[in-house]
């Protein structure tokens, strides 16, 4: 399947330079969205019924958007979201199942001719080795390839919106060593759940970099987001002992004081999706409601990004490899 036009002039990405945002580390999604008017605009959020996805949906719905949530667990999603105010629809979506992705995109297209915001929020982290029906490693398949295929299938709706934004949830986990495109599915090396997570999160950031490069001519801009440390169901594959060893919890089970609430964790996603400060910009990695700076290699606990997620050649290769893996030629 072919999507889009392969012959479009590309441009340089926006610089990784903070914009002195009025919001910051402890800002909440509702604070970011308070002055935003999304009335009549369709927004798609994957996994918008758990963790920071829930607060992303709450804030964007509160701004007047018509929300479509892609949910692997529909019944649970309805339990969570039914009490919310606003226009919120829930549709089945399994990001590890190509047919489910296509069906979801078709259902979205039946509801609207345009999508103004796509938030690729759903993720799994540090899971035991598992493979999808194609044999692809599950973290890479779910976190990156599923969202790549979804963006490709929704591309005509994004391009039709006039100023659409795509928000790709990355993580500080991108700083775990590298992205091995010669063996992304751990077929020739021992599986490491953290390396698998790190390369999937690197792929999310590189996806945003390349999508922005290709989509700018169509008015579609993309952003990568590190939401911060938040205690959510994302940690479900980790034991409490593992989380204590990483300093996330103390011996009494109290979460580290630097962790954000789920509403604070959703703030940067909402900021990237809506902030007027970002007009004319894209392809950047953001954290704490601002564009991030390069990480200090001597301080592994500091914020910021590592250079490989700004590597345009790596982003281009990942894009081409992703097209091959999902069988979709995605050329905006």
Regions inferred by a protein language model and the residue ranges of each:
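C-terminal helical subdomain
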Residues: 17-22, 200, 248-301, 310-316, ...
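A signal for specific C-terminal beta-sheet/loop modules enriched in small/flexible residues
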Residues: 101, 303, 307-308
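Pocket-edge positions in alpha/beta enzyme catalytic cores
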Residues: 69, 93, 257, 307-310
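A short, mixed-charge helix-start or loop-turn motif at secondary-structure junctions
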Residues: 189, 193, 251-255, 303-305
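Rossmann-fold NAD(P)H-dependent dehydrogenase/reductase core
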Residues: 4-244, 248, 324-332
């Amino acid at each position: 399947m072919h999507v889009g036009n392969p012959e479009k002039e590309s441009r340089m990405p926006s610089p990784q330079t903070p914009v002195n945002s009025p919001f910051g580390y402890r800002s909440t999604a509702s604070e970011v969205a308070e002055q935003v008017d999304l009335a009549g605009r369709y927004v798609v959020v994957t996994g918008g019924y758990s963790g920071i996805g829930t607060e992303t949906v709450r804030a964007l719905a509160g701004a007047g958007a018509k929300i479509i949530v892609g949910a692997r667990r529909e019944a649970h999603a309805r339990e969570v979201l039914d009490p919310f105010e606003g226009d919120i629809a829930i549709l089945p979506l399994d990001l590890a199942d190509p047919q489910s992705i296509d069906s979801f995109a078709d259902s979205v297209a039946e509801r609207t001719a345009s999508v103004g915001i796509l938030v690729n929020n759903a993720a799994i982290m540090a899971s035991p080795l598992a493979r999808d029906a194609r044999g692809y490693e599950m973290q890479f398949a779910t976190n990156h390839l599923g969202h790549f295929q979804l963006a490709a299938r929704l591309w005509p709706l994004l391009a039709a919106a006039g100023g659409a934004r795509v928000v790709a949830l990355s993580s500080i986990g991108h700083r775990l060593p590298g992205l091995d495109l010669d063996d992304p599915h751990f077929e020739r090396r021992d599986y490491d759940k953290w390396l698998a997570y790190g390369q999937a999160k690197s792929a999310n950031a590189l996806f945003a970099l390349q999508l922005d490069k290709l989509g700018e001519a169509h008015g579609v801009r993309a952003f990568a987001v590190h939401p911060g440390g938040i205690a959510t169901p994302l940690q479900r594959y980790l034991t409490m002992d593992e989380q204590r060893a990483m300093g996330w919890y103390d011996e009494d089970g109290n979460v580290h004081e630097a962790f954000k609430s789920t509403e604070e964790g959703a703030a940067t996603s909402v900021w990237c999706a809506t902030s007027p400060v970002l007009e004319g910009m894209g392809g950047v990695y953001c954290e704490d409601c601002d564009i991030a700076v390069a990480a200090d290699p001597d301080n592994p606990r500091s914020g910021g990004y590592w250079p490989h997620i700004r590597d345009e050649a790596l982003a281009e290769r990942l894009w081409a490899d992703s097209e091959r893996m999902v069988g979709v030629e995605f050329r905006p």
